[in-house]
UniProtKB/Swiss-Prot annotation:
Keyword terms: Antiviral defense, Cell inner membrane, Cell membrane, Cytoplasm, Lipoprotein, Membrane, Palmitate, Transmembrane, Transmembrane beta strand
Organism: Desulfuromonadales bacterium
Lipid addition sites, S-palmitoyl cysteine: C3
Transmembrane segments: 69-85, 97-115, 163-180, 189-205
One Gene Ontology CC term in the entry: cytoplasm
PTM description: Palmitoylation helps stabilize the inactive state; may self palmitoylate. Palmitoylation plays a significant role in pore formation.
Domain free text: The N-terminus has marked structural similarity to the mammalian gasdermin N-terminal domain. The C-terminal region wraps around the twisted beta sheet core, probably stabilizing the inactive state. The beta-stranded transmembrane 'fingers' of the active protein form by local refolding of several alpha helices found only in the inactive state. Reorientation of the N-terminus probably flips the palmitoyl moiety for insertion into the membrane.
Coiled-coil positions: none
GO biological process: defense response to virus
Protein name: Gasdermin bGSDM
Record-stated family: Belongs to the bacterial gasdermin family.
Record keyword Cytoplasm present: yes
Length: 266
């Protein structure tokens, strides 16, 4: 059993899993492989499965306003977890986090607020029908073996935003006020920093492009090369990340918990 990881669970109450490094190109119908608490992104579903004669790929619904998430806040997070999340967001935006911890050194807790959140999604019923009609690509070797071992997942929904707002509080529960120009000087020009006033406890970090920061997925079950079932991935149970680096040669490799431990050339 794994210890509870607050980084993984901060989106749980909203029904999503986290993307450890938010990205612009994460979307539904992508293939993931589990490695411990994380899921590695492998590629598009149409590179693994060949559509049958009757059912096409599910239709992607893009840029639907996620009204249930926009304007919502997380619960209180420790300042360490909050700054870790903020650091990954700033890194994805092309900003710097060096020196930011000194500005938040008097903070005890942090809270994130999600603004202008949009969702890309596919209907799970349509995906279920597609999987029932599709065949495994005959040229897929290692990933097809992972599919047969029930180690693969398909993304079904992603949430994205250009704005990530964080509010910090001190140990006595009062707001920690920060100076907007000071924060802007630390993170750099790639990130727009704003607030209700030049000195404020609630700071919005804005990217020029939407970044995907949460996802939903289903696990695939296959038997003798045929699709049998799907199972929703529990929210807050896993994080998505890029392929890891092998320590010996630096090459990207797919690592899994199953018998197929290292696959090169993915």
């Amino acid at each position: 059993m794994w210890c509870k990881d607050p980084f993984l669970t901060y989106l749980k109450e909203f029904g999503y899993n986290v993307i450890r490094l938010p990205k612009a190109d994460v979307k539904p119908l992508q293939v993931l492989a589990r490695c411990g608490k994380d899921l590695n992104r492998l590629g598009e579903i149409n590179n693994l499965l060949v559509a049958g004669d009757s059912i096409p790929l599910p239709r992607l619904k893009e840029n639907t306003r996620a009204a249930s998430i926009s304007g919502q806040r997380t619960g209180d997070l420790s300042v360490g977890v909050g700054l870790s999340i903020l650091g990954t967001v700033l890194g994805a935006m092309g900003g710097s986090k060096l020196g930011l911890d000194t500005k938040y050194q008097n903070a005890k807790t942090t809270m994130f607020e999600f603004q202008d959140v949009f969702e890309d999604t596919v209907e799970i019923i349509e995906l279920d029908k597609f999987l029932g009609d599709a065949d495994i690509n005959p040229f897929s070797r290692h990933v097809a073996e992972l599919l047969e071992a029930d180690d693969l997942y398909i993304t079904t929904s992603t949430i994205k935003s250009t704005k990530f707002t964080i509010e910090a509080k001190k140990s006595d529960g009062t707001a920690l006020e920060l100076t907007i120009p000071d924060i802007q000087g630390i993170v750099g020009g790639n990130v727009k920093v704003s607030g209700a006033a030049s000195v404020t406890s609630k700071i919005c970090y804005e990217s020029p492009i939407p970044l995907v920061f949460g996802f939903q997925a289903v696990r695939l079950f296959y038997d003798n090369g045929r699709y049998t079932a799907i199972e929703p991935l529990d929210s807050g149970s896993a994080g998505m990340k890029a392929l890891g680096k092998a320590p010996s040669d630096g090459a990207a490799r797919l690592m899994t918990d199953g018998p197929f431990l290292r696959l090169t050339g993915v």
